Curated annotation (Swiss-Prot):
Matches recorded under PANTHER family: UBIQUINONE BIOSYNTHESIS PROTEIN (PTHR12922), UBIQUINONE BIOSYNTHESIS PROTEIN COQ4 HOMOLOG, MITOCHONDRIAL (PTHR12922:SF7)
Membrane topology, record value: Peripheral membrane protein
Cofactor(s) this protein requires: Zn(2+)
InterPro entries: Coq4, Coq4_euk
More info: This protein may be expected to contain an N-terminal transit peptide but none has been predicted.
Role summary: Lyase that catalyzes the C1-decarboxylation of 4-hydroxy-3-methoxy-5-(all-trans-polyprenyl)benzoic acid into 2-methoxy-6-(all-trans-polyprenyl)phenol during ubiquinone biosynthesis.
Listed pathway(s): Cofactor biosynthesis; ubiquinone biosynthesis
Disulfide bonds: none
Protein name: Ubiquinone biosynthesis protein coq4, mitochondrial
Oligomeric form and interacting partners: Component of a multi-subunit COQ enzyme complex, composed of at least coq3, coq4, coq5, coq6, coq7 and coq9.
Swiss-Prot/TrEMBL catalytic activity: a 4-hydroxy-3-methoxy-5-(all-trans-polyprenyl)benzoate + H(+) = a 2-methoxy-6-(all-trans-polyprenyl)phenol + CO2
Annotated EC: 4.1.1.130
Amino acid sequence: MPPTPRTALLTVSNRCLQCHEIGLKYSFRSFSALNRPPPSYPGHVPLTRIERGVLAIGSAFGSLLNPRRHDLIAALGEATATPYFIYRLRDAMLSSPTGRRILRDRPRLTSETLKLPYLRSLPENSVGRTYAKWLDREGVSPDTRDSVQYIDDEECAYVMQRYRECHDFYHAVTGLPTMVEGELALKAFEFLNTVIPMTGLSLAAAIRLKPAERERFFKLHLPWAVRSGLSSEELINVYWEEQLERNVDELRAELGIEAPPDLREIRRMMRQQEKRAKEQQMKASGL
């Protein structure tokens, strides 16, 4: 049964309250731009509060102007995830036996570790085959994810990296494409599941949709995102490497994710309707 509005509000409020309580325990380190502490891990760039704020604002505006600037979206995610939200996500992993194993093992999702040729050989409806087919159809690679730079805590940096590398699995099990409309639907789902601010802020890109796309998003995909995002398990705790041979429908049901409206099929049907309407108009005008 889908959550009631009151239950949904309480769920989000509780997750945000957890973020606030965690934030009372963790604060930004104070230092100047001329006296930076040493990096906590390879590639780490310590930022002052002002620098973090400027990075958040600049990357937010830049990614709104060009939603395909994945580097800006990544920077926005890191700049707004601390000090509260990334710790909540880390603690969600610590509260789960599988999440703790992931934190201990530190697996990485790359084309080498996933062995894409093997995934393509798996049964048709398996998680691995579905994931590989989605990568091939969308023309993307698991190796394109940016490395985390701006999160100070080394363990939390891995949590953000893990979330980032799992994003394509979320696409695959839901079937949502990488077009703006599909990304917005997935980001809305991720926001309610992870409470990472960047995923919620990304919804501002809805202003870039065409009127028909925007109406479809708010009527179909946003309600789906709310239902599934609030009722599903914490996806950060899925050990995807161990699920590759499972049936994707069974896993989706186990995680509490409702299959979203098929965006590609909807767009295909609309194109056909527009084509028929145009042909009828041409016949009526005698052309």
